[in-house]
Design a protein with these regions (language model features):
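His/Met- and acidic-residue-enriched segments that coordinate or traffic transition-metal cofactors
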Residues: 2-10, 14-195
């Protein structure tokens, strides 16, 4: 009897550890930084939406921070970039991400939600912006950064468009994702051309 209880206990412990490992893998695979590390993967098709990303407050914070980062990085590129294609891309990003933020604010208002946009970049994005400003080959660093940032933004938008909890904000995510996909495609093309 004791032996059966011991075996059952070991089995439960083993299953619990296996389940913990699976949660860690799923959660880890859903982070934008790790998704950006696999540029040719299609994470939206294979990654389960973390429960907090289906909630409007988390999505709004991430989407707004992404837009804020894109605008600030583009302003930096407008002054530091040497390649005309990189400068043109930066100009387009200021316009597009300013519009995206305005559209997000409208979606929030239309939804009746009381959600506030962040007023400052999160530390990780502020650090990326600071590092970008110090890059020796700015054009290449900016375009590498843009590919990563747009992939991360696209992943968040696609997941919220699929699993989001507020229909009007979900519609914003669905409408914005194709625009971000276009930016990602442009960024990859320019990145590949920049030496």
């Amino acid at each position: 009897m004791t032996r059966h209880l011991l075996i059952a206990g070991v089995a439960v412990a083993a299953l619990s550890l296996a389940a913990c490992g699976q949660q860690t893998e799923t959660k880890g695979a859903a982070t934008p930084a790790e998704q950006a590390a696999t540029p040719d993967a299609n994470p939206a098709a294979t990654v389960i939406t973390p429960s907090n990303e289906a909630a409007a407050p988390d999505f709004v914070a991430k989407a707004a921070a992404s837009d804020m980062f894109e605008v600030e990085a583009a302003k930096l590129a407008q002054t530091k970039a040497k390649n005309p294609g990189v400068k043109k891309f930066a100009d387009e990003m200021v316009t597009a991400h300013t519009k995206s933020t305005a559209d997000l604010k409208k979606a929030i208002a239309d939804s009746g939600q009381t959600l506030a946009l962040p007023t400052a970049l999160p530390k990780d994005l502020q650090d990326k912006l600071s590092d970008l400003g110090k890059a020796e080959n700015f054009d290449k660093a900016y375009m590498d950064n843009q590919v990563d940032a747009h992939q991360a933004a696209l992943d968040v938008l696609q997941r919220y468009a699929q699993d989001g909890d507020v229909p009007v904000i979900k519609a914003f995510a669905a409408a914005t994702a194709p625009v971000v996909q276009q930016h990602l495609d442009m960024a990859r093309k320019i990145r590949d051309a920049v030496k």
